[in-house]
Design a protein with these regions (language model features):
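Catalytic machinery of carbohydrate-active enzymes
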Residues: 1-151
Length: 151
Protein backbone atom coordinates (compact mmCIF):
# COMPACT_ATOMS: atom_id res chain seq x y z
CA UNK A 1 0.00 0.00 0.00
CA UNK A 2 1.18 3.50 -0.86
CA UNK A 3 0.88 6.21 1.78
CA UNK A 4 -0.24 9.50 0.27
CA UNK A 5 -0.54 13.02 1.64
CA UNK A 6 -2.94 15.50 0.06
CA UNK A 7 -2.05 19.06 1.02
CA UNK A 8 -5.50 20.54 0.58
CA UNK A 9 -4.65 24.24 0.26
CA UNK A 10 -3.73 26.33 -2.80
CA UNK A 11 -1.67 28.81 -0.74
CA UNK A 12 2.10 28.57 -1.25
CA UNK A 13 3.06 29.52 2.31
CA UNK A 14 0.53 27.14 3.83
CA UNK A 15 1.85 24.40 1.54
CA UNK A 16 5.44 25.00 2.66
CA UNK A 17 4.22 24.87 6.27
CA UNK A 18 2.97 21.30 5.64
CA UNK A 19 6.53 19.97 5.23
CA UNK A 20 7.09 19.03 8.90
CA UNK A 21 3.78 17.14 9.08
CA UNK A 22 4.53 15.28 5.84
CA UNK A 23 7.95 14.31 7.15
CA UNK A 24 6.47 13.06 10.44
CA UNK A 25 3.86 10.95 8.63
CA UNK A 26 6.62 9.45 6.46
CA UNK A 27 8.65 8.63 9.57
CA UNK A 28 5.62 7.10 11.32
CA UNK A 29 5.07 4.70 8.41
CA UNK A 30 8.83 4.23 7.88
CA UNK A 31 8.38 4.70 4.15
CA UNK A 32 8.47 7.38 1.50
CA UNK A 33 5.11 9.01 0.81
CA UNK A 34 3.32 10.24 -2.31
CA UNK A 35 2.62 13.97 -2.12
CA UNK A 36 -0.43 15.55 -3.79
CA UNK A 37 -0.20 19.33 -4.03
CA UNK A 38 -0.75 22.31 -6.30
CA UNK A 39 2.87 23.35 -5.58
CA UNK A 40 4.95 20.30 -6.58
CA UNK A 41 8.20 22.28 -6.88
CA UNK A 42 8.36 22.48 -3.07
CA UNK A 43 8.51 18.69 -2.66
CA UNK A 44 10.52 17.46 -5.67
CA UNK A 45 13.75 17.02 -3.73
CA UNK A 46 12.40 16.01 -0.32
CA UNK A 47 14.21 12.79 0.68
CA UNK A 48 11.01 11.28 2.14
CA UNK A 49 8.85 11.95 -0.96
CA UNK A 50 8.14 8.93 -3.18
CA UNK A 51 6.52 11.07 -5.90
CA UNK A 52 4.84 14.44 -6.25
CA UNK A 53 1.55 14.74 -8.13
CA UNK A 54 -1.32 17.16 -8.65
CA UNK A 55 -4.36 16.33 -6.45
CA UNK A 56 -6.38 15.49 -9.58
CA UNK A 57 -4.26 12.36 -9.99
CA UNK A 58 -5.19 10.83 -6.61
CA UNK A 59 -7.93 8.73 -8.22
CA UNK A 60 -5.42 7.09 -10.59
CA UNK A 61 -3.61 5.41 -7.70
CA UNK A 62 -4.63 1.92 -6.61
CA UNK A 63 -4.11 0.68 -3.05
CA UNK A 64 -3.33 4.06 -1.51
CA UNK A 65 -4.10 5.50 1.92
CA UNK A 66 -4.54 9.30 1.80
CA UNK A 67 -3.88 11.67 4.68
CA UNK A 68 -5.65 14.95 3.85
CA UNK A 69 -3.98 17.93 5.52
CA UNK A 70 -5.54 21.31 6.29
CA UNK A 71 -8.94 20.88 4.60
CA UNK A 72 -10.54 18.50 7.11
CA UNK A 73 -10.62 21.10 9.90
CA UNK A 74 -10.30 24.56 8.33
CA UNK A 75 -13.48 26.51 9.02
CA UNK A 76 -15.04 23.64 10.95
CA UNK A 77 -16.66 24.33 14.30
CA UNK A 78 -18.04 22.45 17.24
CA UNK A 79 -20.65 23.40 19.79
CA UNK A 80 -19.66 23.88 23.41
CA UNK A 81 -21.96 23.16 26.32
CA UNK A 82 -24.43 26.02 26.32
CA UNK A 83 -24.56 26.40 22.55
CA UNK A 84 -21.53 28.63 21.88
CA UNK A 85 -19.53 27.53 18.83
CA UNK A 86 -15.77 27.30 18.53
CA UNK A 87 -14.25 27.45 15.04
CA UNK A 88 -10.94 25.91 13.96
CA UNK A 89 -9.01 28.97 12.74
CA UNK A 90 -5.52 28.59 11.39
CA UNK A 91 -4.85 32.30 11.97
CA UNK A 92 -4.89 31.62 15.72
CA UNK A 93 -2.15 29.00 15.81
CA UNK A 94 1.12 28.09 14.12
CA UNK A 95 0.17 26.89 10.64
CA UNK A 96 2.66 24.01 10.89
CA UNK A 97 0.77 22.76 13.95
CA UNK A 98 -2.57 23.28 12.16
CA UNK A 99 -1.50 20.74 9.51
CA UNK A 100 -0.43 18.29 12.24
CA UNK A 101 -3.62 18.77 14.27
CA UNK A 102 -5.64 17.95 11.15
CA UNK A 103 -4.09 14.48 11.49
CA UNK A 104 -4.62 14.16 15.23
CA UNK A 105 -1.12 14.95 16.52
CA UNK A 106 1.17 17.90 17.25
CA UNK A 107 4.79 18.54 16.38
CA UNK A 108 7.58 18.91 18.92
CA UNK A 109 9.87 21.94 18.71
CA UNK A 110 12.50 19.77 16.99
CA UNK A 111 9.98 18.50 14.42
CA UNK A 112 8.86 22.01 13.39
CA UNK A 113 11.93 22.62 11.20
CA UNK A 114 10.89 23.33 7.62
CA UNK A 115 13.47 22.39 4.99
CA UNK A 116 12.99 23.09 1.29
CA UNK A 117 15.55 21.25 -0.83
CA UNK A 118 16.57 22.75 -4.16
CA UNK A 119 19.17 20.48 -5.73
CA UNK A 120 17.94 20.37 -9.32
CA UNK A 121 19.08 22.92 -11.88
CA UNK A 122 16.48 25.60 -12.42
CA UNK A 123 15.55 27.19 -15.74
CA UNK A 124 17.17 30.59 -16.32
CA UNK A 125 15.65 33.54 -18.13
CA UNK A 126 17.53 35.37 -20.93
CA UNK A 127 19.31 37.60 -18.42
CA UNK A 128 20.52 34.66 -16.30
CA UNK A 129 17.99 35.02 -13.50
CA UNK A 130 16.17 31.96 -12.18
CA UNK A 131 12.61 32.03 -13.55
CA UNK A 132 10.73 30.32 -10.72
CA UNK A 133 11.84 30.51 -7.13
CA UNK A 134 10.57 30.79 -3.59
CA UNK A 135 11.96 33.35 -1.21
CA UNK A 136 11.48 32.67 2.47
CA UNK A 137 11.86 35.60 4.80
CA UNK A 138 11.57 34.30 8.35
CA UNK A 139 10.40 36.94 10.77
CA UNK A 140 8.20 37.43 13.78
CA UNK A 141 4.54 38.15 13.28
CA UNK A 142 2.21 40.52 15.07
CA UNK A 143 0.10 39.62 18.06
CA UNK A 144 -3.20 37.92 17.26
CA UNK A 145 -5.06 40.18 19.68
CA UNK A 146 -4.16 43.86 19.20
CA UNK A 147 -7.09 45.64 20.87
CA UNK A 148 -7.10 46.89 24.47
CA UNK A 149 -8.28 44.49 27.15
CA UNK A 150 -10.94 46.95 28.34
CA UNK A 151 -13.05 46.44 25.22
Amino acid sequence: MIIGIWIDTPALGDTIAAIPTCKKISEAYQTKVAIFTTHPQIFLDQPWALCVQHPRSIETFIDIKIHRLFGPIVGKSYEMFGGEKIEWRYSNMDIRQFHAVSQGFTLTEEEMETKVYVSRPRELSNNGVIKDYVMIHPTQTWATRTWPEEM
